[in-house]
C-alpha cells in the first residue's frame, strides 16, 4: 500500500471511511469499511465492524489507519434523519481534495417515488462528469 499518491497513481480498491453514531447525544466513531464486489459480503463485514465498535477507544482511530493521508477512501457521512435539498461540505485540503466526500441523507417517498439526497464534493481531476453520472444512475437503480 502506498502512503503518498498523486493524480497519476491508480488505486484498484478503496474503503469507505464513515462516522457511525453510537449514542443519542451524537457521539460517533469513524470506521473504515473495506470494499467488496458483492453487497452481501460488504454488508456482513460492515455489520461486524460496526457491531464491534468499542466505546472506550479513540473514536478517530480508523482515520489513523494506513497513515494520515486518507487517500484510499471515500469519505461518507450518512445523515438518515436529515432530508436536504442542498449541502455544502468542507474538508481539510492537505492534498488538494483528491478524494471524494459524500453525504447521503434520509430516503423519503416523494410523488410515489423513493428519493434520497446525495451531496458530493469531488475534484474534477479525480472524477469526471461522466463517471459521476454513472454513480447517480446506480443509486437510482437501487432506489427503484
Where on the chain are the PLM-derived regions?
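Active-site-proximal acidic secondary-structure segment that organizes catalysis
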Residues: 1-4, 29-40, 52, 101-144
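Hydrophobic "lid/gating" helix adjacent to the active-site nucleophile
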Residues: 1-18
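Glycine-rich, charged/polar anion/phosphate-binding loops
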Residues: 2-3, 61, 86-89
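A short beta-turn/loop motif at secondary-structure boundaries
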Residues: 8-11, 66-68, 110
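Short beta-strand elements
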Residues: 17-22, 104-108
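Helical lid/core segments from catalytic subdomains that handle acyl or acyl-like groups
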Residues: 22-84
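Flexible, Gly/Pro-enriched loop and linker segments at secondary-structure and domain junctions
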Residues: 71-115
Amino acid at each position: 500500500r502506498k502512503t503518498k499518491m498523486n493524480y497519476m497513481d491508480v488505486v484498484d480498491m478503496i474503503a469507505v471511511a464513515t462516522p457511525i453514531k453510537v449514542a443519542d447525544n451524537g457521539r460517533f466513531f469513524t470506521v473504515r469499511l473495506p470494499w467488496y464486489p458483492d453487497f452481501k459480503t460488504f454488508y456482513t463485514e460492515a455489520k461486524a465492524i460496526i457491531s464491534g465498535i468499542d466505546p472506550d477507544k479513540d473514536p478517530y482511530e480508523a482515520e489513523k489507519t494506513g497513515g494520515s493521508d486518507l487517500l484510499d477512501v471515500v469519505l461518507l457521512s450518512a445523515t438518515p434523519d436529515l432530508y436536504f435539498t442542498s449541502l455544502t461540505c468542507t474538508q481539510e485540503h492537505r492534498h488538494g481534495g483528491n478524494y471524494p466526500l459524500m453525504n447521503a441523507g434520509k430516503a423519503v417517498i416523494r410523488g410515489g417515488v423513493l428519493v434520497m439526497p446525495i451531496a458530493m464534493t469531488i475534484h474534477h481531476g479525480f472524477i469526471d462528469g461522466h463517471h459521476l453520472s454513472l454513480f447517480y444512475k446506480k443509486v437510482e437503480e437501487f432506489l427503484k
